[in-house]
Structures are given as C-alpha cells and as structure tokens.
Amino acid sequence: KLFSIIVLIFVLIISCNEQKKSSTSYLEISNKSQIDSITQTFIDREIYPFIYTRLEDSNGTVAYENLAKNERLLADENIDGDSWIRIWSMSKIVTICLALDLMEDGIISLDDSVIKYIPEFSDLKVATTQDSMEIPSVNWYEEDSNRLGPCPLSYVENDSVMTILHLLNHQAGFYYSTTNIDCIDSVIANENLAAAENSQDLINKMAKLPLIQHSGSYYYYGTNTTVLGLVCERATGKTLAELVKERITDPMKIEGLAYDLPKEATMLPRFSGKDSILRIAKEGELDIFGQNVPDYDSEHQLYLGGEGMIATANGYSDFLRMLLNKGTLNGYRFLEENTIDDLTAPHTQKDNSYGHNGYNLWVSKEPYLEKGRGDKGLWIGGGYEGTHFWIDTKRGFVGTIMTQMFWVYDGDYGYTKDDRIRGAIYEPWTQIPYSKN
C-alpha cells in the first residue's frame, strides 16, 4: 500500500510538471485593444476571412489571443486555438527538425547524396533557357524586352551531386508550379503531385520533371523539403506520419499537429480575393502544384513534408516552444542545443539587409526593429494560405497568426498583415510604430 501511495505521488508530481505552470503569463501585453483594432482593419476591409492571433510564453501559458472574423462568411464558425488549419510551408520546419533528429542519431548526414536514398532521381536533368541560362539567374516576373523568353527549354546534365544539405537550403533544384514560365509550370502541373497515391508514386512523378538549376548554384524555394521528407522515409522505412508521431508529437505530448484530419473534426474553407471580392476559393484556384492540393484524408497515404501538415494554433505553438526552449518540451529533449544553433545560423541569403535564412527559418535583422515590425533576432516562417509564426528568444515567447487565405486582392495593405500585427505587439517594448517604408 505504501508503495502504491509513493507511485501515485510521483505520477501527480510528473503530471503537474507537464501542465502549464500558471494561468498568468510572465509576458505582459499592455496594448491588447490596439492589437485587436489593427487586426480588425483587415476584416473590415474584407481582405481576410478571419485572423486568429496567439502568443504563448515558454511555459505554454497564453499571454494574448484574439479572433477577428468576417461574419458574412463565417458567422456559424467557432474559430479558436483548437481549430484545424492548413499550414502548408509551416510543415517545412517540422520536417527539417525531424531530419536533424535523424542526423543526431546517425541515420542520415548533411553530405549524403539524395540518390543514395532515392535512386529514381539519378537521371534528373537540369532545364536551361534558350539562352542556355539557369532559370533562377533571371527574375521572370520582370518584363525585359531585351532578352529572349525562356522557352523552349533545353536539358543538360546536373553538374553537381545533390545532397541533403542542398535540400535543407532550397538549393537542390526543385520548385513549385509558380515560376511564371509556362513551359516549366505546365510540366509540374501535368504531373499533379498532390494527387500521387503514395510516396512511391510521388517519386515516380517527380523523376519525370527537370531540375530548375544545377544543385547548389542558387537558392530557389520549392519542393526541396518535400524531397527531404521522402529521404527521411527511405532512410528509416517509416512514413513521415509515423516519424512525426514517434519522434515529435508523442514524446513531447503535442496535440494538434498532424498530416491527417482527425475523425469528427472539420476544416475551414479556403478563401480567395482574386476577383477583388472575398469569397470561397474555386476548385483548382490554389495553383502551387498546378492542380490538386493536399486532402488530409487518412486513407490517402501521401505525406508532403514541405506542404502537407495541418495544425491547431495551440498544437503548433507547442512545437515552436520546443525550438524556443532549445530543443526540449515537456521534459523531453528532441534536439541538442547545438543543433538549434545550426538551424538558425546563416546558411543562405546572407547578404540580405532584412535577415538571413537558417534551414528554412528566417532570422530578422535591424530593419524589423527600425521599421516597427518587431525586433531583430526573431525566427520567422509562414505558409501558403497566410499562416505566420515567429519565435522571440529574447523575451521568451512564440507567436502565431492564423488565417486561410490564398489570394489577397488588396495586396498593398493586405500583405502587411503580419508586420502590422507583430509591430503593434512590439510597440510598447520598442517605442517604434509600424512604418511601411
């Protein structure tokens, strides 16, 4: 009996340690009404369908949360920190951290060749323009009457060995169907990657596509992290969903971060402002893959490491707190501190005055502070449907701004959402108001 009592006391102590320390956060937000008001402007102008903002301190205590929503479109929707959100590229940092965990265990390494795990990619060619240039060497969104168009394309051998490091840094040569070059966008659209049956089918589809550059030559944002997820699967013999559950969500007791929508749960609609009016997005309108988008169906065993996760603000904040706490959460060490340091160290875009890229994690510099958009040293990321996060290691908190919006029609104001809201949060600390210029 005495032994049972001791065990019970031990369990209670552990349980208390796993729960939030206090209902009151050490992080003081003194201007909540100002933040609420700025957020509401994006709703009143019918630029966004809803905006849910949440700040959590390192203990998981909510220091601030606010929902502003369009009553015309979402009157009957209850949106809060437990609502499931399509997070798109906010999946990338999860997959990257998973890969870093596998590296700590010696299962993969930065210098490993990608074809060691995916031999189907051994014959990938590099697409070049009719001027024999690498496609990322030119901004194809800018008009220039003095240059030839990129099409028709030519195809050459990749002059470098594609490595896992290239995947981490978006330098491998993979891309989305948004290059603004029809003869390459149409090729990836025709393969309809998000409709692949499983990882093998996805690999088969991607093996038919050209690379957009020689591996290692440029930073070019695309499906590189999706391929990284495929490498993790091949290296372990497990699916990404299994790896996330076994290595991340279960041991760190994170709920609200997954690939499949739980039974009985629902997803919010996709919205678009492409016609200068806020409305439900049309089928096929989200064109990042050219055709289909992820369906989050548990029967569809395709796990896109760069785009395919869903999360609640509550659950995703827990994952961010692991990074804030230098690799630990709820008494479990997931990554070593030196791994977190490497994750946020300068890897690409080192000469950008606004910040640098770690492993797909933006680290802000002085202009964020000077222009009233937050502070320097913030770790920042976001997703295709307007989701956003940041980590403030100086003040010890994480922030998420959630919405589900594809095309912002009033881009001049609409795309300042994250900077304006974040700027308002920081204004009492920095005494610097938001400045667009």
Task: Map each language-model feature to its residues.
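Sec-dependent signal peptide recognition
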Residues: 1-8
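C-terminal motif of bacterial Sec signal peptides marking the signal peptidase cleavage site
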Residues: 13-15
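Short, conserved catalytic-motif segment at the N-terminal edge
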Residues: 28-87, 107, 123-131, 410-411
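Short, surface-exposed loop or secondary-structure junction motifs
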Residues: 123-376
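Short, surface-exposed beta-strand/loop micro-motifs that present aromatic residues
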Residues: 378, 385-398
